[in-house]
Amino acid sequence: KARSKVSFGGKYDNQGIIKKTTTLRYEKARILGFKEHAEYTLQKRMAGSTANVNKFLERLYEVYYPAAKKELEEVRDLARKDGVEDLQAWDSAYYSEKLKKQKFDFDQEELRPYFKVENVIDGIYKVAELLYGIKFTEIKDVPVYHEEVRVFEVTEKNGDFLSLFYIDLHPRETKNGGAWMTYFRPQGLCDGKVERPLISIVGNLTPSTEEKPSLLTFDEVETIFHEFGHALHGMLSSVTYSSLASPDVYWDFVELPSQIMENWLGEKETLQLFAKHYETQEDIPDELIEKIKASQAFNKG
């Protein structure tokens, strides 16, 4: 609520800029022969047309609305127990999280001991090897921009070179927040020759301390799996022109490889590849895996 007050008033109010932007977009689309900006934009999207987008949204509504309505009522019931009769948007996240803890008795901190960052990275590589037959070998003789950066050579099963893969996972004062995939060289033509890519993922994961190694939350593990999906898309690209390589593809496709990779994290077989207690080396218990899966399905309507 406080954030909204700052955004919608005073020197930070950008409503006028947004209105001008949407007007100019509409005018541009009309000049180019389209009915509206959406129709113009969708010429370079898989959806292809506003009619297809609307059909897709209608199908989603039919499937999700009953579940969403039921889930929202559960959140409202919990809020009423605290005397909140009219649940507002700014209260929704708080009561949703409270309900999640009540239903699943699930605390992210329970999982940290099983997600040592080195084990997570090894697990990601195992998944990639099982699914795509590719191998990751750490190399030390490549220049890097910071001592924390690790570099891996990615090869096909037959030894053919696919990519160099740089990982830079922990926060520094000079680093932007968040996590992302990028490349130092895309796959495609470079100086007249089709080159393999130089791919990187960058993050700001929980760092190690004097007492403990880097132990991640489940959300952080999910983030790295997601970004690695983008990285895989880049590593496995095989095109002549880099404008067609990952991530320079249709924007309503670009998140698919990352979502697929992220999805594997919810599978028991995946977690058993790498989720081991950093002190005892015991596998993550089935009970915790079931809690993870149940919590992932929570409030998905």
Describe the residue ranges of each PLM region.
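Substrate/cofactor-recognition hotspot
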Residues: 5-8, 12, 20
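General secondary-structure edge motif
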Residues: 8, 108, 208, 238-241
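Alpha-helix N-cap/helix-initiation motif
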Residues: 10, 14, 113, 117, ...
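Active-site-proximal, well-structured secondary-structure segments within enzyme catalytic domains
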Residues: 19, 23-24, 28-204, 254, ...
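Active-site recognition of the HExxH zinc-binding catalytic motif
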Residues: 26-33, 128, 207, 212-235, ...
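Zinc-dependent metallopeptidase catalytic helix centered on the HExxH motif
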Residues: 227, 231-264
